[in-house]
Amino acid sequence: MYSYTFDSETGGIVLNSTPTNFSKEPRPVYSQEMDLLGFDKYWSYKKQNDTPYMWAESNVYWYRNTQIAKTKGGDLYTAPELQPVRDEAGNIVFGKETGAVLVPIEIEAMNKRNKDLLTVIEDSTVKKIVKEYEKYKKKLDIFHVAFSGGKDSAVLLDLVKKALPKDSFVVIFGDTGMEFPDTYETVEYTKKQCEADGTPFYISRSHFEPSESWKLFGPPARVLRWCCSVHKSTPQTLKMREITGKDNYVGMDFVGVRAHESLTRT
């Protein structure tokens, strides 16, 4: 993860050229989350979910390079407490009483400000993908992109498409049967893109329905992480056996897990 600063003009973030080993990982915040936390009690904003309004670092909320709120507490049964930030006069920053109306992040303008650095990062990553492909292509039966429908795997797929020949890899979506509707929309959209540009796209599923596996194994947990093996990795392995026609195929997976993510995640 690269270090960054919040941009007061676009409402976005500006990446710095220095990578950092410690990342707060800013998260875009949409009005749906704001409504759930009670932002509409203190701030005025349009109820739309096409574009985020601000960023959150853990429990701290930033709007246009200004901290405007944080949350405290909260668990499965108790809502977190929203704590607005007030100025020296006691007014809520950008609050309703000031007449301010929160506006969404200017995505296109933010992208333009980050274009040069993103181009450097993209070119470097594409070269790494090509290097690994050339190193192993004669030793393997299949290269595949593990597609989840999330942002990381979407970026990964775009990079692999730019790096490798169309017929040199396949894309496999591991359908757990427990994805959000938005994920399935993204998968369908990506599948159509792949069909249009000639990239093989497959969907793998377990023969277990989610309701069956929950009854057999109980809910997934950090200690008993059966869900991935039952509903993702094993079905994908079976799908690659089907694609290659080999039970003992040798393959390489391109997976969208970033190097600076936590050890628990990786």
For each of these PLM feature ranges, what is it?
Residues Y2-T266:
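ATP-dependent adenylation/nucleotidyltransferase module used to activate substrates
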